[in-house]
Amino acid sequence: MTQMSPSDVPSMGRRQFMNLLTFGTATGVALGALYPVANFFMPLRAGGGTGGTTAKDELGNAVTATGWLSNHPAGDRSLVQGLKGDPTYLIVDGDAAIGNFGINAICTHLGCVVPWNSGANKYICPCHGSQYDANGKVVRGPAPLSLALTHIDIDDDNVLVSQWTETDFRTGDKPWWA
């Protein structure tokens, strides 16, 4: 057998080319399949420039501050759809203004929606009896943690809900939900 001169030998063989093509295709498919998974765990922020999501009422309509305050008296705690569609309490302060924080209504024990009991002035979970004070701090188990907080902002009369990442003012700890 005669040996070919170095200038006649191709730099990449057919097998090497097919291996690179197969690897490139598999990598593209894997990255394409991982995008929805990554987007699920790290969703893009929805909403305006403040990064907030517009609160929605039980019919899915955007909540406005003037409309909400005209129908809800001081001290009222009523549910809206907040972050990720979770039920979130909007609190009407004594000075006829919407409070600067909201309370996520999902119980930290087993995920039931916790109703506000105005007679007892606390949230009482119907599933296993966990109780939370007026600010959502756990006062009686079996729930291990306080209810999650959200920021409430008013922008051009729209009520915006955004993630609470600062220290939890009720406990002085880092927020467990952030």
Swiss-Prot record:
The family database entries (InterPro entries) matched by this protein are listed as: Cyt_b6_f_Rieske (IPR023960), Rieske_2Fe-2S (IPR017941), Rieske_2Fe-2S_sf (IPR036922), Rieske_Fe-S_prot (IPR014349), Rieske_Fe-S_prot_C (IPR005805), TAT_signal (IPR006311)
GO CC terms on record? plasma membrane-derived thylakoid membrane
Q: What is its EC number?
A: 7.1.1.6
Where's it found, cell-wise? Cellular thylakoid membrane
Report any Pfam family annotated for this entry: Rieske
**Segments passing through the bilayer:** 20-42
**Cofactor(s) the protein requires to work:** [2Fe-2S] cluster
Q: Which UniProt keywords apply?
A: 2Fe-2S, Disulfide bond, Electron transport, Iron, Iron-sulfur, Membrane, Metal-binding, Thylakoid, Translocase, Transmembrane, Transmembrane helix, Transport
- What are the cysteine partners in each disulfide bond? C112-C127
- Quote the record's cofactor note: Binds 1 [2Fe-2S] cluster per subunit.
Which residues participate in [2Fe-2S] cluster binding?
A: C107, H109, C125, H128
* Single annotated GO MF: electron transporter, transferring electrons within cytochrome b6/f complex of photosystem II activity
Q: Which reaction does it catalyse?
A: 2 oxidized [plastocyanin] + a plastoquinol + 2 H(+)(in) = 2 reduced [plastocyanin] + a plastoquinone + 4 H(+)(out)
The topology of this chain with respect to the membrane is: Single-pass membrane protein
Residues in Rieske domain copies: 71-161
An example of a Gene Ontology BP annotation on this entry?
Answer: photosynthesis
Mention any additional remark. Answer: The Rieske iron-sulfur protein is a high potential 2Fe-2S protein.
Function, as annotated: Component of the cytochrome b6-f complex, which mediates electron transfer between photosystem II (PSII) and photosystem I (PSI), cyclic electron flow around PSI, and state transitions.
Q: How does it assemble?
A: The 4 large subunits of the cytochrome b6-f complex are cytochrome b6, subunit IV (17 kDa polypeptide, PetD), cytochrome f and the Rieske protein, while the 4 small subunits are PetG, PetL, PetM and PetN. The complex functions as a dimer.
What protein family is recorded?
Answer: Belongs to the Rieske iron-sulfur protein family.
Annotated protein name in UniProt: Cytochrome b6-f complex iron-sulfur subunit
Tell me what gene encodes this. petC
